[in-house]
Amino acid sequence: MKKYIAEMIGTMVLVLMGCGSAVFAGGLADTVGAGVGTIGVALAFGLSVVAMAYAIGGISGCHINPAITLGVFLTGRMNGKDAGMYMIFQVIGAIIGSAILFALVSTGAHDRPTATGSNGFGDGEMLQAFIAEAVFTFIFVLVVLGSTDPKKGAGNLAGLAIGLTLVLVHIVCIPITGTSVNPARSIAPALFQGGEALSQLWLFIIAPFVGAALSAVVWNYLGDKK
């Protein structure tokens, strides 16, 4: 049970810090003058992963992302029961993080599109968004699988490599979708945002899972002993 709780806490921190930076960099920047820009948001997500990797990595492996859990499961590193429980607790943690963030922004008159840090895409941009989310999730999860491989991995540097990769992914993908590469990170804000964020949510669940599955296939080949 401890590893499930660890995943819940880690995902809560990721959503609160990452989406929180997006909210206060975008939706509230004009009113409080605290905008940090794309680089700042990217760093917030990446540094959250680094921090949690060294905080809970020894307990749960610090997936804090259903796409990563799927990749780990498909490479035979965890069983189906644990994979399912990880995903459930990740979503719960994300909802808690979004609830805290929603409470913070709803205390004032901040009715902005970025009020919860939800993901989305514009008219005619669905294919672009799907490709971006699938490709960048593929890259991200491949780095996770490679850097955490028991024999070929980066050891204690894995957390840093994973966090920096997430920073790079956000820098490129934020202008396209706001960057998800993490179904839990998208589900929770969409539940509080509603409307278009909820109607477009399917893409931010399916595309990351497609990318994660492809990364598992590739790593099963690359990491094969033969």
Protein language model features and the residues they cover:
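Membrane-interface helix-loop junctions and terminal tails of multi-pass membrane proteins
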Residues: 1-226
